[in-house]
Every structure is written in structure tokens, then in C-alpha cells.
Amino acid sequence: MIHTATLIHDDVLDEATMRRHLDTVNARWDNEASVLLGDYLLAHSLCLTSSLDDLYAVRELSSSARTICDGELRQIESRGNFDLREDQYVSIIGNKTAELLACCCRLGAYYAGAEPQIREALDRYGHHLGVAFQIADDVLDLLGDEQTVGKSLGTDLLKQKCTLPLIRLLNRVSACERPELLDLLAASDNHRREALRPWFARFDAIEYARGQAEKFARLATEELHLLPPSPALDSLRELTRFVVQRRQ
């Protein structure tokens, strides 16, 4: 429910019109309805968790919601900052995206009665998985097909978000070519996404980003070594593979 709320709010921020092959809430109604619906879902999720026998879930979800908002605010602040470093980008998506997955893993482990060591390992698993997911998602935003992916694409460029492929490109482009690239990034041309593809290919920016996504996926898988063999463990490993291989 919290995840759905963040997606509704994300679509407002990105001015997206399609999500999961359907019109977004803001496209079908308006931004006001979207903000209120997202807020309602957040509030309702906290109401549900507060009805549990202990306060662990409500504490964890409240803390994660705050961290996610911090990540979103930092991303907004970094728009148009084409000097953003890779470690800063990873820190932002660690809050914006990875925190929610880490929280889900913490909650699942806690309510399953797992030992603290396993809960901590699954927390790290969720974090690494979330970073891998976001990097792969940022690649899809640049190269994916909207009908296949099922959501609005190119919004990162539209909002001048400096994602990992772009950071890699900016780090590798020569000083004499950098002004041309920055002019292209600043343009309002609807075909900017296509115009940038040769740049990404020339400097292996997409392959680098995919490699980093796979690195974080491997880190996630390594955190599962404490878990005994089970269908649940198989599902977590399969989920990790899916995150970096998905095309939608």
C-alpha cells in the first residue's frame, strides 16, 4: 500500500501519464486527487499497522516513509546538477527506492521469528536489491519501449535527473564535447531521448550501468547465505535475477 502511494506521488512529480499499461491517477483525474489519494493510502497503511499487537511495524514503516521522502527531496534538489557523483546517486536511490524493499524484508523476517543476524542480512539484501532495481529502471527509462514497459518513459531526462548512465557518460565525455552534450540535455526537444542514444552507446554508459545493477544484485544474493534451503529462498534468488533482467 505504501509502495502504491509512492508511485502515485511519483507520477505527479514526473508528470507521467501511464503506469502498468493504464492511465495514471493524475492523467485520469488530476494532481490534487493524486496527492490526496497517495496521502490516504499512506495514512491507511499506518492505521492498519498500528492495530498489530506490537509497534514494530508502525515504527519501521514510519521511519522508512520519512527516509523515502528524504530521498525524493534530495533527488529534486539534484535536478539539473550534471556534476552529481556516482556515490551521491547511489545514496539518493538508497533512500528513495532501496529503503522500502529493505523495510519489507525486515518486517517479513521479524514476523517470521528470524534471529537478529538473519534479519540484518535480509535488511541488507533488500537494500542491495532496491539499488539494483532502480539502476535497471533508470536504464529502461532511457532505452525501453513504452508499450512493453507499460509506463511513461523519458521522464528522467524531462526532469533533468542525473541517473547512473548519464553520470557515466558525463564522466567519460571529453572536455571539448561536454558543452555539446550539456546543450542537448538542456534542450526541450521531444526527441532528445533518441538523440542521446548514440552518446550512451559510444561511451558504454548503458553497459556500465547494467554492470553496476548486476553488482548490487550479486551483493544481494550473497546476503542470503544464512538462509536454509527452501522454496522461499529460491524465490528470493529468482527475484534478484528478474530485477536486473526485466524489460518491463
Predicted regions and their residues:
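All-alpha prenyltransferase/terpene-synthase fold signal
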Residues: 1-248
